[in-house]
Each structure stands twice: as structure tokens, then as C-alpha cells.
Swiss-Prot record:
GO terms for cellular component: ribonucleoprotein complex; ribosome. Belongs to the universal ribosomal protein uS10 family. PROSITE patterns: RIBOSOMAL_S10 (PS00361). The gene is rpsJ. It comes from Bordetella parapertussis (strain 12822 / ATCC BAA-587 / NCTC 13253). GO terms for molecular function: structural constituent of ribosome; tRNA binding. GO terms for biological process: translation. Involved in the binding of tRNA to the ribosomes. Keywords: Ribonucleoprotein, Ribosomal protein. This is Small ribosomal subunit protein uS10. Pfam families: Ribosomal_S10. It comes from the Bacteria.
Amino acid sequence: MKNQKIRIRLKAFDYKLIDQSAAEIVDTAKRTGAVVRGPVPLPTRIRRYDVLRSPHVNKTSRDQFEIHTHQRLMDIVDPTDKTVDALMRLDLPAGVDVEIALQ
């Protein structure tokens, strides 16, 4: 796997889970001899929703909700076969979305 790069993008609503998962991935990759760049914190995406409180009148009375999506980006440079096997066997929490791309 010479001259290849693995790009890992993590997304989660809880920043503690995403930092914990990123640290676990970095430790696993470094144990197998790969070079890791990151984790790089990407901008937090905030989605805001306004919902009417009343089903009939009182248009000015609303509830406001927010969802924060935290993101991290990591690059694993020159991964070995052991690195790929270790990352495949890695068990991450259910609240973390992982996107892996080979470049």
C-alpha cells in the first residue's frame, strides 16, 4: 500500500465521543507503524429549528431547538496491511459516524 493515504472523517453530536474515538484511531494507527496527521477539528455545523408552540394561534410564541454536529478529519499516510486490519477490527461507539476514503 505504498503511496496511498487513508482519509477518515468522523461525525457525532457529542464532542466527547468524537474525541475519544479519534484518540483510539490515532493510537491504533501509530501502534502499527503508520504516520497520522490530525485529528483536525472541522467547523461545527449548527442546525436550528423553530417550532410553533400553539396548534392554532399565537404565531409569535415559538420553541427553538439546535443540533450541533461535530466533525474531525484524520489522514493516515503510508498505511501498512496491519494498519488496515487493526482499523477494520476497531470497535467505535454507536453515536459516531465514520467515513473512510482511500486516496
